[in-house]
Curated annotation (Swiss-Prot):
This is Uncharacterized protein TP_0916. It comes from the Bacteria.
Length: 42
């Protein structure tokens, strides 16, 4: 396997990793925002 290809694969997996993390974080933030809004309504 060529070093260039390996580096490309590493950056791709790193990109999906960070993308997955931001997706999870945004879900948690959304739940928190919904929770805060719900408490304000009560």
């Amino acid at each position: 396997m060529a070093p260039g290809l390996w580096e490309q694969e590493q950056s791709l997996s790193c990109g999906t990793c960070t993308y997955g993390r931001t997706e999870v974080n945004s879900r948690i933030l959304r739940k928190l925002r919904v929770g805060i809004g719900y408490e304000r309504e009560l």
